[in-house]
Every structure is written in structure tokens, then in C-alpha cells.
């Protein structure tokens, strides 16, 4: 405390009389410094979690095509796209206020990945840790933990997947529908909802298809909080994507 007391006194002597100091006492200065240290530590911890998971899962995360996706460069041609854009943007802006998850379902090439990446990019800019992973990559890395040369266990991987602020699982329904895959997805959703962390899912399946694939238990947990289910029903516009739009 002596350091802060002496520092504060010197600061007061050097400061012009017409300038009001930000801190009224050395205790205020100490409290501010401790708070900044806490915020910095939390930020580093979040970044380390995301980096650790991206190292483990290799080519996961926001892919190059979607790295510059935002709400601003999402193309709107009709009311359906306007509706999903508004809802996705609101979800990102209100992320801190609830534990809601989301499901984007519908036809391929309709903008599900764009808006999911826009949510991810928005949250990264606001200090959150996010991870996008396909089911294929997820299961490949899960099965890789059984290898005798793996330096991470299945439990370690499940724990890390449950620790990022937002986990988005892509290509739900393109897998082989094995029992192990259902068990793993169920465990991930269960752990994340129990720890009040949100999960996003992207799929070409409709509501009935998702329920049949994952089971009522998983779908029910995805409804926690002010959850979001958006349906992308229009034609694909991938044929018009050049790669330099974003």
C-alpha cells in the first residue's frame, strides 16, 4: 500500500490544480489496478482456451472463406434473409445477458455459416472465446484420443470443448449416425448447458430430422434460455460467391 500512497501523492503534486484526478485516493488507484489485472488475466485465459482448442482440432475454427463475414456484409434479397440477420445480430449483442443456444437449419448454401461466423467474429471482438468445429473433425479428434501416441484424453477434450464461451458444431446430420457420435454430442451439450455456456448447431435437417437424430434430451437442452432456431428456406447462392466479397 505504501507504493500506491507515495505514487498517488507524487501524482497530486504534478497535476495542475484545475485538473480533477480520476482517483480520489490511493485506495481507489489500488482497486483500479487490481481490477485491470483481473480483466487482463481473464482475457488471456479466454484466448488461451480458444488457441488450445484450435491447436488440438487442427483445421477447425472460422475458416478462411468466412473470416471476414459480418452482419454488415450479409447480403439481403428478401424478408427471410432480413429476419434471420436481425435475429442473429440480436443474439450476438445480447450474448452476455442469457445462456441461450441456437440452431441454424435449412438448405445448403443459404448463409448459415456466414451468420454463424459473423456471430463468432463479433464475440471475438468483444473478448469472448469461440470455436466452430464440424462433426467430422470433432469425431476424428475424439477417436484420436484412443491412440497410444495422443497427448490428450477423451475427458480432456470434452472438458476443453465445454470451456469456450461459444461452441458451434457444423454439419449436424452429415455424420454416419453412430451411437458414439450421439453420445459425444449429448455429453458436450449437457456439460455446456450445465455450466451455463451456449452451443450453436448448423444443419441441413429440419426440426423433426434434428430431433430424430439427436434425441429429445439434446433438443430440450438447446431450448434453455431465450434460445434461437432459425430456418434458412431459400435457394443456395454459393454459385455467386467469388471469394472476394468480404
UniProtKB/Swiss-Prot annotation:
<dbReference type="GO" id="GO:0003677">
    <property type="term" value="F:DNA binding"/>
</dbReference>
<keyword id="KW-0238">DNA-binding</keyword>
<keyword id="KW-0639">Primosome</keyword>
<dbReference type="InterPro" id="IPR002611">
    <property type="entry name" value="IstB_ATP-bd"/>
</dbReference>
<keyword id="KW-0067">ATP-binding</keyword>
<keyword id="KW-0235">DNA replication</keyword>
<dbReference type="InterPro" id="IPR028350">
    <property type="entry name" value="DNAC/IstB-like"/>
</dbReference>
<dbReference type="GO" id="GO:0006269">
    <property type="term" value="P:DNA replication, synthesis of primer"/>
</dbReference>
<feature type="site" description="Probably involved in the interaction with the DnaB protein">
    <location>
        <position position="69"/>
    </location>
</feature>
<comment type="function">
    <text>Required to load the replicative helix DnaB onto single-stranded (ss)DNA, to initiate chromosomal replication. DnaC alters the inter-domain and inter-subunit interactions of DnaB, inducing an open ring conformation that allows ssDNA to access the interior of the DnaB(6):DnaC(6) ring. Has ATPase activity only in the presence of DnaB and ssDNA. ssDNA binds to the central pore in the DnaB(6):DnaC(6) complex, making contacts with both subunits.</text>
</comment>
<comment type="subunit">
    <text>The helix loader is a DnaB(6):DnaC(6) complex with a crack opening large enough to allow ssDNA into the central cavity.</text>
</comment>
<dbReference type="InterPro" id="IPR027417">
    <property type="entry name" value="P-loop_NTPase"/>
</dbReference>
<keyword id="KW-0547">Nucleotide-binding</keyword>
<dbReference type="GO" id="GO:0005524">
    <property type="term" value="F:ATP binding"/>
</dbReference>
<dbReference type="GO" id="GO:1990077">
    <property type="term" value="C:primosome complex"/>
</dbReference>
<protein>
    <recommendedName>
        <fullName>Replicative helicase loader DnaC</fullName>
        <ecNumber>3.6.4.-</ecNumber>
    </recommendedName>
</protein>
<keyword id="KW-0378">Hydrolase</keyword>
<dbReference type="Pfam" id="PF01695">
    <property type="entry name" value="IstB_IS21"/>
</dbReference>
<comment type="similarity">
    <text>Belongs to the DnaC family.</text>
</comment>
<dbReference type="GO" id="GO:0016787">
    <property type="term" value="F:hydrolase activity"/>
</dbReference>
